[in-house]
Amino acid sequence: MDALRGSELILHAGDVGSAEVLRDLRRLAPVVAVRGNVDTESWAKTLRTAEVVEADSESVFYILHRIADLDLKPKAAGFAAVIYGHSHQPAIDWRDGVLFLNPGSAGPRRFSLPVTLAKVEIVDGELRPEIIHLL
């Protein structure tokens, strides 16, 4: 959790795992989370499958769990970034001027994947993404 201290907003792309995780994150900053395929218990019913977040006056983010479920053209829809999860494979990619970001997984190690999260700093309207390795 130390890596998230000082965050203005926390976005979670699903596979939260428990209501306690959300509670702990909300102690650090406001949280917007979507439901992942492992979020099947009653606490997760309030989570939507996708969210739109205005990160600042110029940057609107689209958050979903599975990138395969993306059913819109992000640039045409006015999104600066698409935040997604599911694979737990951290990735930063730019497509047609839109940031595609998978923060990976900050929870228990999955398979042989690294334990990571991502931060996006917005400076003068420019998105500056970074993958942070926790282990």
Regions found by a protein language model. Name each.
Residues M1-A55:
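Core catalytic region of metal-dependent phosphoesterases/phosphodiesterases
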Residues V32, V38, L47-I63, I67-V82:
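Glycine/small-residue-rich loop that forms an oxyanion/phosphate-binding "nest" at active or ligand-binding sites
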Residues P30-V32, L99, R128:
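Conserved beta-strand segments of alpha/beta enzyme cores
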Residues G17-V21, V38-A44, A68-K73, I83-W94, ...:
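Active-site environment of divalent metal-dependent phosphoester hydrolases
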Residues V52-D56, A77, W94, L101-L135:
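Binuclear metal-dependent phosphoesterase catalytic core
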Residues L9-D15, V32-G36, Y62-H65, A81-H86, ...:
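Active-site neighborhood of phospho(di)ester-bond hydrolases with catalytic His/Asp-centered motifs
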Residues R27-A29, G78, D96:
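Short, structured coil segments at secondary-structure junctions
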